Regions:
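Active-site- and interface-proximal helix/loop "cap" or "latch" segments in soluble metabolic
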Residues: 14, 21-23, 35-215
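N-terminal "first-domain core" detector
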Residues: 1-35
Length: 215
């Protein structure tokens, strides 16, 4: 259901965040984020002059390139629009994220490397939805299909007698109400990580079965 009807009000500001995930032909992943801000009225900017309604105050983007372990192997950050001429100077410093793995403690480490005056507030904030987009991309059914096809092309077929590797714990578990480890969603889609009262029976029934996570 949508939000309830609002009281009378005047629209002043719009922030848009767009994130996209891509599987690359070399088997890596590109996760891109863009953030824009605009006002609904004309206002002055000392550096850029008058900004009309709809002119972008901020327009900033970042691309993280990840390997299959969610380790960042390359970063590109750009500032196309900003309120101050020096804002874009910090963009190259986002290379400090190279080597960092998206997972537990990711945001804490981002703040340690790029917090305060060592980074751009808006691009740092953008890394939150970018990280979530990475998981949504890599754990999708289509992504698994593309990854298997790539491995086959590269001669990395899995042999029939090769034991299956245990899958990593899905990031969503215990990070969302619906994905509580003892709840029905985990029981259905990730029974190997289910912790409900009938966990032993559920895990035993799922042993050896490949369960495709929903997109």
């Amino acid at each position: 259901m949508p939000l309830s009807p609002p009281v009378g009000r005047q629209h002043l500001h719009t922030r848009r965040v767009t994130c996209q995930g891509f599987f690359r032909e070399d088997g890596l992943w590109d996760i891109e984020g863009r953030i824009t801000d605009e006002k609904t009225y004309e206002h002055a900017n000392e550096w850029r002059g008058p900004l009309k309604a709809g002119d972008l105050v901020h327009d900033m983007s970042i691309r993280l390139t990840l390997d299959h372990k969610f380790t960042i192997v390359d970063v590109e950050a750009v500032t196309d629009k900003s309120p101050y001429p020096i804002c874009g100077e910090v963009a190259p410093d986002f290379k400090k994220l190279i080597g960092l793995r998206i997972g537990g403690g990711f945001h804490r480490e981002v703040r340690a490397r790029l917090g305060g005056v060592h980074g751009c507030t808006h691009i740092v904030e953008l890394l939150g939805p970018v990280a979530t987009t990475a998981f949504q991309t890599v754990f999708s059914g289509k992504a698994r299909e593309l990854n298997r096809a790539h491995r086959t092309r590269m001669g990395h077929e899995v042999k029939a007698d090769e034991p299956a590797k245990p899958r990593p714990k899905p990031y969503m578990i215990d990070n969302c109400y619906a994905w509580a480890a003892d709840g029905p969603v985990v029981k259905r889609w990730a029974p190997d990580f289910y912790t409900g009262p009938d966990a032993d029976a559920v895990r035993a029934a799922a042993a050896g079965k490949e369960i495709e996570m929903p997109d």
